[in-house]
């Protein structure tokens, strides 16, 4: 048999399209030709596969070899095609006799010794193979990842010889051990934060409803400390969420996907991060920070120091929960459903009023002008974190609640939302808000008048209603009351600050 066909999977974002490896041996001058839009890393497979076959006790065919990676229009990169190419060569040269090739897919890089190495994107490949009705063989380096899927459709091996013996019916391959769904509770606790009761209340609301939060305050008041406590208030990842997050992480960091797959992601990029680093990029786009924060938290400290175009690029993903990256060689969609938490100083000197203020209203407004209005509109809550009052440090943390206590209320509020609308309040669409966020007529009139006075947009009105709905859920109340709306309005610090500065300049 001079022709062999082996199935494998490409890595194209979180998708894994089927790739057919076709190998044909013919008479002629010995040589190897590889077609099907392979990258340089794929072309290097000829040397790796040759050495792996020889060191595994097989002969490299001394014939004219043509290898086709179909379909030809899909770009291919990386060493993930080594194992299927080696198997196809062995079958085509009749060194391996098997009739079971069409029942399996193979993904793995080969060492020169014939050992198997892990590849990025093993989870999407395994899920797509199972969906197609085939089993998949991967390296034991990827065992922890594909073990998240469970079942016996994923098999692991350490060496090319093991795979060949399995296909010949001489031995069996074992499935990966399924990971125990244990929670990782190593989160920082709210008890560490002294004072800042309104900030803690805002964190509870944000955790319960999935809202975005902007923290404004002078340096050293605990903005970053508060933000880092949010993951400890959130529920653990569900099985589906864990798979989604692990699939994204496996594209860029194998170690993280193995060891931290149950933790909600908490990404805190530096303010010098580029547009490509934040939203994703490359000739074949890789996920950026917003996708790595999927199902978790994206924390942006020193918000005005980020490039404006980087921040404005976040506007669409915040609304849609995904990012579409178009490049000349590939167009890829990545999920990006994250909670945005940001922190900033109110002025370039850190203060905008009081004895510490050294900036004029014009300088402060120019500083805040780095943030576009549409971007600020994406925050459901904005809160001022003031300097602690005198005496608070000597009192310690008396009567403070732990993250575990607050988390119980958060879980109860989330359960109410799931029973009512099967999604968090922050993700409610306009038509759903009519049923879930109903107001009494007098409250609706009062809210509209208040928004007109503050000069807020319709988007801000929608976000206010969602926050009020979450406050009502935390209070275990069915209808939104006036005091829920008043508390939601109290979390509009950025609007009050801008109005105050404009009055000072008038």
Stretches found by the model and what they are:
Residues 1-214, 218-224, 261, 326, ...:
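Peripheral, non-AAA+ core regions of ATP-driven protein-machinery
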Residues 41-46, 61, 68-78, 284-285, ...:
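Basic, amphipathic alpha-helical bundle interface domains used for macromolecular binding and assembly
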Residues 168-205, 209, 237-290:
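P-loop NTPase nucleotide-binding/switch module
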Residues 214-255, 320:
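Walker A/P-loop
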Residues 217, 280, 302:
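The Walker A (P-loop) glycine that initiates the GxxxxGKT/S ATP-binding motif of P-loop NTPases
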